[in-house]
A protein has these predicted regions:
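N-terminal glycine-/serine-/threonine-rich phosphate-binding loop
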Residues: 6-92
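Conserved phosphate- and dinucleotide-binding cores of soluble alpha/beta proteins
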Residues: 15-19, 68-179
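Residue-identity detector for glycine
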Residues: 1-2
Length: 179
């Protein structure tokens, strides 16, 4: 099952809310767990907190990163890594979101790691989304565009299909962000 870890409006800067969400999420991590390590600024706080617990206590976990950026950060934090080829499932996956609706529907993937994030989330017994008040929207897609990750060989058909559905689709190459 999934859950949403939301830190309500706090009388502090947004980075403090993100840090609070990340550190609260790490309380779910137990020794022996295999943990999906998500992507984004809020999840980065969780990865740093996991690394701190590994260094300062007897926490032993294995992480599966959802992006090149989270893999790099996990290594810097001293989190041992594995892959989904090497293990069957994850006990927990922690990840962020780009937008959250009042019904707790999400948009993810603007960082360019959508497919990896989805695969890791699907392999987790529990999927926890870390968010802060800046991600709240009344309607998904109201603030920014909806990301759709497409294989290079499918770019033409997908663009034609989206345009046929009335979307104003454009291509952004995966050379930026976290992917």
């Amino acid at each position: 099952g999934g859950s949403l870890l939301f830190i309500p409006d706090l009388p502090c800067p947004m980075n403090e809310a993100k840090k609070a969400a990340g550190e609260q999420a790490v309380e779910l991590v137990r020794t022996g767990m295999r943990v999906g390590l998500g992507t984004g600024s809020t999840t980065a706080y969780a990865l740093r907190a996991i690394g701190r617990r590994i260094r300062e206590s007897s926490l032993h976990v294995m992480g599966v990163p959802t992006s090149f950026a989270s893999e790099r950060l996990a290594r810097e934090c001293g989190i041992p890594l594995t892959t989904l080829d090497e293990i069957d499932e994850l006990d927990l996956a922690l990840d962020g979101a780009d937008e959250v609706s009042p019904d707790l529907d999400l948009i993810k993937g603007r960082g360019g790691a959508h497919t990896r994030e989805k695969v890791v989330a699907a392999q987790a017994r529990r999927f926890v989304v870390l968010t802060d008040p800046s991600k709240d929207v009344e309607r998904l897609g109201a603030k920014r565009v909806l990301p759709v990750e497409v294989l290079p060989m499918a770019t033409g058909p997908v663009l034609r299909t989206l345009t046929g559905l009335g979307a104003n689709a454009s291509l952004r190459m995966g050379r930026e962000k976290d992917g």
